[in-house]
Amino acid sequence: ILGNGTEYINDDETILIDFNTNNIEWTSENRNVVGVRVLLTYSEDETSNGAGCAAPGASQPDPDTITGTVTHDDFNGTTSGQNQGQGSSSHEILVEWYNSSLYFSGNATNMSESEIKNELDSDGAGLGLYFLEINVEAESNDQLGCNHTDNDEEVEYSVEVVLLNYEITPA
């Protein structure tokens, strides 16, 4: 894990969190970092009050949009998700910089060993600084006699590097 935590983010605010692979306690010699995976988890904390909230649907919260962007050197990815009222919601951002179709096919016909390595080995490109931006667009629309308040959201994040182990065996 590159990092994880919880942030309370105000409406229309973007926070920036930085991570570095130098802070990872590696459990193996494998440093072939070929991607990054971010999981953002959030719920709805909109409140409503007033006599009109008893009307069907009047106290229903409006979905908020949570956007995450992860960046490492020239590699980046952005994904948005929305909370859906009760319970928690989440979405994932996955950025990879290796030939995953070659890896998952398990077959590299008509390729030399060095060509295969060029497609699967990051050659250190995954080491170093990573940045995660999280933005919240909180929505709260008042109904007749039912006032809604939604100024921020609590967002949990988990950032993991994707390691690739592979072995090249002649056919």
Language model features with spans:
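N-terminal leader/pro-regions and domain N-caps
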Residues: 1-9
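Hydrophobic transmembrane signal anchors and adjacent membrane-proximal interface regions, especially
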Residues: 7, 91-95, 102-106, 118, ...
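Intrinsically disordered, low-complexity regions
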Residues: 14-16, 21-23, 63, 113, ...
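Signal that preferentially marks extracellular ectodomain short beta-strand elements
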Residues: 22-25, 103-124
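C-terminal edge strands of extracellular/lumenal beta-sandwich accessory domains
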Residues: 57, 119-171
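Generic secretory/membrane-interface signal
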Residues: 90-93, 112-115, 144-148
